[in-house]
Swiss-Prot record:
Localization annotation: Nucleus
Gene symbol of the encoding locus: sin4
UniProt protein name: Mediator of RNA polymerase II transcription subunit 16
InterPro entries: Mediator_Med16, Mediator_Med16_C, Mediator_Med16_N, WD40_repeat_dom_sf
Statement: the UniProt record of this protein carries the keyword Transferase: no
Origin species: Aspergillus fumigatus (strain ATCC MYA-4609 / CBS 101355 / FGSC A1100 / Af293)
Length: 955
């Protein structure tokens, strides 16, 4: 029998044209790398979030090999002032804790401080941001959990924090101006009675776990079995958890495609805990689960028509439902920003996806890639058979529990694969990310696409105002920033990509649409106000402002923010409100950041005003807390670390006051020739940019100066009556006293000078007929635009002609004139620039830091480095740097003493800078071990051996 090939059969006749292997099949679209693996992952387990952006600003993501967790964050680059993603920092404690197990899920808690990491065996470890965004310490080890495949986590949720926050419903245009609707948003339980962290997990085997932290910081756990109708229902694939007013709502999906709904209550015994109660000792609260409702929805499959025909088209075959698998399960709550409260019931949303490579035999019957199946959760009365009415009841007023129902809504189809569904902007927007990298915003209630063109007079979110994500290269995992102004994606190769939301700002087709521009500014303002009220990091908003807005638009945003919060800039009377005002430092911080250029270039004049006010506020609050924590001096002596901080801020406050006086003396000399020509005086004042003059005229900064004087006077008087001090505390307090004693102006004389300025400002307002209702306008002009309003020109004239000359007899003007104020960083002269390039000042302690090798002259640095291969005069040192203002702090560990720790926490400086930006740990740098001289009027801060040893370490 001859072989087939002997007849000379051409192989090309079997497969098509010569040189081609085209089989006549329809061409398939190219899928992103790793998409098939991602869809399989989403199908097999509900908890598979590989990247998460916390509300504190930290981005954590799992490496491509699944063994490490890295963190990044937004930061302002000191060299050029550009906002970028930081370099990645590996979290070594995570790798050690999980011992080689594959990491599958990340989840931040509501404040964005604690991070939960789950591996493929269901083991959970918990970490916390300690002193910087890239400094995370372990709290709970994964070794506490057994290594069991049945313990895999399919659903996870953190307990909310029990605190009421300020929120904003919307912005509506009224008579040409935007009106913002603030209200108080109450938290949704359940809560930990000690206000500690709590984590709820659902496992594959149908076990609900609560990991909670005891008052001593240790973690404990309780667990219970979810009620199931059969054994096969226990094998869960997905679980969605959310806090509601009626308890925790849990939706689960089992391997047999059953959807179960539970309502779980966590009961604590005792319900309250007072750690201050000593006798009798109060036991720690112990939780327990109580199941309230259970509902089973068996039909959770895909029902639909052919995607190439209209909905409900008759006579057309349905697409193959059995091909679809559940790849996502979520519970969507109604918007939290609602002044009437969250009254609408939640929705259950399930994502069903078709296999990536389906059979091509009947392409006309192929369904869409993704189908969104939705159920409305309804509660109604439990209806009984009429015969039950004839049965006598012992309880006439017996209450029947409401029935929990799931009402299926219309399905939503998409020809693209959905890889993520996120509820952003406080529940106002549902963001769905697809496999091609596109992000589409939907209305959570109707699933209608939000395109931003519906109503230009009402703004509820960034998406509704027209912000969108432009098409970019695809990624497999996504997480949105705290205020949804940006997103970070993780691609198939484990690389992160930053994506920013964009807007036309009214510039379309060469024309300007004022309505769209105004709506965009209002949306950014609304997002900023919501972030301030919820104590959320707003660096993503700042990123948009810096990259996309013109200086004029930035000024419009600042004015809107002051009006929306609202902030009354007039503090001529109610000065005590300054100390505890939550929004003033937020606005000052973003003002100062908008004018930052780079580390070596002076800020813009308009931003230098809020920057100086932030420093004055820091010193004022520091002195107030110093006296508060040292009232019981006999039982709680002064802490050396606190006194060192007070010493540095005292020197800074004195030098700042001398700098203000020196500038005013120069201004008085410049304007002396114009004393008889008021018109010329006014014109010259318009062209004068003087930071000290604006600081004195503004009631806000003038009040802070008065608070500082009060604190300095109290410290000076308290030295004689202080409890006996020893060691470093005695040295620091003695230096504080000596610094005040040798000052070229007495504190009472400076207070008298401030009183004269205050009198001149009051007379100017009174002379112009400005009452309390009219004064906020000029005060805002000073603070926001750094301009002297016309109503205060007479006050400037009085200050320069009367108040300043009257002070000359009470000061040592030569000492003030010869002082070196370059270390303050507020002037634009060459001496300040040289100091800025060679030294850093600890922004918290106000103590000059040791110069790093990069700041030393190049020849000296090279000479030191060439000595035997390494420098004998340099040591390694780590510092913290603010991601917003780029200032540094030499502390790289939490305060050691309890008093110092309480002080730093009360000041809000444990994780954040004076400006409100977050800290990041810099890589190790070389610093000079030899002390260098401080500028005139600024003595070198003494560093005790014990403190120096602590500062040398890193967290």
């Amino acid at each position: 029998m001859p072989l087939i090939m002997e007849d000379g059969i051409n192989v090309d006749d079997l497969f098509g044209e010569p040189g081609s292997l085209e089989l006549g099949l329809s061409p398939s679209t190219t899928s992103p790398r790793g998409l098939a693996q991602r869809l399989d992952e989403m199908r097999l387990i509900g908890c598979c979030q590989k990247i998460a952006w916390s509300k504190l600003g930290c981005i954590a993501y799992i490496s491509q090999d699944g063994l490490r967790v890295n963190v990044r964050h937004l930061q302002c680059r000191p060299s050029d002032g550009k906002w970028v993603l930081s370099e990645e920092t590996p979290l070594l404690p995570v790798t050690d804790a999980h011992g080689g197990h594959t990491l599958v899920h990340l989840c931040w808690n509501e404040p964005g401080v604690e991070l939960a990491v789950a591996d493929s065996s269901g083991r959970v470890s918990i970490y916390s941001i300690s002193i910087a965004l890239n400094s995370i310490a372990g709290h709970r080890q994964a070794a506490f959990d057994p290594d069991d495949d049945g313990a895999q986590i399919v659903g996870m949720m953190w307990l909310n924090t029990q605190r009421t926050v300020h929120s904003f419903y919307q912005a509506a245009k009224v008579q040409g101006r935007w009106a913002y609707s603030p209200f108080r948003r109450r938290p949704i339980g359940p809560f930990h009675p000690v206000n500690k962290a709590g984590l709820v997990c659902v496992t594959r085997s149908g076990i609900i776990r609560l990991l909670y932290q005891n008052p001593d910081g240790r973690w404990a756990e309780i667990s219970a079995e979810l009620k199931n109708t059969g054994y096969s229902d226990r094998l869960l694939t997905h679980a969605a958890l959310v806090s509601t007013q009626g308890g925790i709502l849990i939706a689960t999906h089992s391997a047999c495609q059953k959807l179960c709904l539970y309502r779980v209550h966590i009961a604590w015994t005792p319900t309250q805990y007072d750690p201050g109660q000593q006798k009798p000792p109060v036991p720690w609260p112990v939780p327990s689960f109580r199941f309230l409702h259970c509902k089973v929805e068996s039909q959770c499959d895909v029902r639909g028509t052919n995607r190439h025909a209209g909905d409900n088209a008759p006579g057309l075959p349905s697409f193959t439902n059995s091909l679809y698998c559940l790849t996502g399960l979520d519970i969507v709550l109604p918007a939290l920003d609602n002044p009437a409260g969250s009254t609408a019931n939640p929705w259950v949303v399930a994502i069903y996806s078709a296999p990536l490579h389906v059979t091509q035999d009947h392409p006309q019957q192929q369904g869409p890639a993704s189908v969104f199946v939705r159920w409305q959760l309804d509660t109604g009365p439990l209806t009984l058979h009429p015969k039950f009415d004839d049965v006598p009841s012992k309880k006439n007023n017996a209450q029947v529990k409401p029935k929990l129902e799931l009402r299926r809504l219309d399905d939503v189809y998409s020809d693209k694969y959905a890889i993520s569904i996120d509820q952003i902007e406080y529940g106002n927007v549902l963001a769905i990310t697809y496999d091609d990298g596109s992000v589409v915003f939907y209305d959570p209630k109707t699933m209608a696409v939000v395109n931003g063109v519906d109503d230009a007079n009402t703004v509820t979110s960034l998406a509704q105002a027209g912000f969108h994500h432009p098409p970019e290269p695809s990624g497999l995992h996504i997480s949105f920033s705290p205020n949804a102004c940006a997103a970070v994606m993780l691609d198939g190769e484990g690389q992160t990509h930053l994506r920013l939301t964009e807007h036309s700002y009214g510039a379309e087709g060469g024309l300007h649409d004022e309505n769209k521009y105004s709506a965009a500014i209002a949306a950014l303002t609304l997002a900023f106000c919501r972030g301030c009220g919820s104590d959320v990091n707003t660096d993503d908003i700042l990123l948009i402002l810096v990259r996309q807005l013109t200086p004029e638009a930035q000024a419009t945003f600042i004015n809107e923010a002051y009006r929306a919060l609202p902030i009354n800039c007039n503090f001529t009377v109610e000065q005590d409100k300054l100390m505890n005002h939550p929004y003033i430092p937020r606005c000052l911080s973003i003002q100062a950041a908008l004018g930052f250029k780079n580390k070596y270039t002076p800020r813009s004049f308009a931003s230098s005003i809020p920057w100086a006010v932030l420093q004055l506020r820091h010193a004022s609050v520091l002195y107030a807390f110093f006296f508060q924590y040292n009232k019981g001096g006999t039982t709680e002596p002064h802490d050396p670390d606190v006194l060192r901080m007070v010493l540095g801020n005292t020197k800074w406050a004195l030098d700042f006051s001398f700098y203000v006086l020196n500038e005013l003396f120069d201004l008085a000399d410049d304007f002396e020739s114009l004393s008889g020509d008021q018109e010329a005086f006014t014109q010259k004042l318009k062209s004068t940019s003087s930071l000290p003059l604006i600081i004195l005229l503004s009631s806000m900064s003038r009040a802070f100066l008065r608070f500082i004087c009060r604190g300095l006077r109290g410290i000076y008087a308290g030295y004689a009556t202080a409890a006996p001090l020893s060691g470093d505390a005695r040295v620091y307090y003695a230096e504080i006293y000596q610094t005040l004693e040798s000052a070229p102006i007495r504190i009472d004389a400076y207070e008298k000078f401030l009183a004269g300025v205050d009198s001149a400002v009051r007379h100017a307002y009174h002379g112009a007929g400005f009452g309390d209702a009219e004064r906020p306008g000029p005060e805002k002009e000073l603070l926001v635009n750094a301009r002297v309003p016309p109503v205060l020109v007479p006050a400037v004239s009085t200050i320069l002609r009367q108040t300043v000359p009257a002070l000359k007899t009470e000061i040592d003007r030569i000492t003030i004139y010869m002082g070196d104020y370059s270390w303050l960083g507020l002037s634009n002269d060459r001496r300040t620039e040289m100091y800025r390039r060679s030294r850093d000042v600890d922004i918290i302690k106000k103590i000059p830091c040791r110069p790093t090798a990069s700041a030393l002259p190049e020849t000296n640095a090279n000479a030191n480095a060439n000595q035997n291969g390494k420098s004998s005069t340099q040591v390694q040192q780590r510092r913290r740097r603010c991601v917003r203002c780029c200032e540094v702090s030499s502390d790289t560990h939490p305060p050691r003493s309890l008093l110092s720790f309480r002080m730093i926490v009360k000041l809000g400086l444990l994780r954040a800078c004076v400006c409100g930006g977050m800290w990041t740990l810099e890589p190790s740098v070389y610093s000079s071990a030899q002390p260098s001289g401080a500028p005139v009027g600024q003595a070198t801060g003494r560093t005790p051996a014990l403190v120096a040893a602590g500062l040398a370490g890193s967290s």
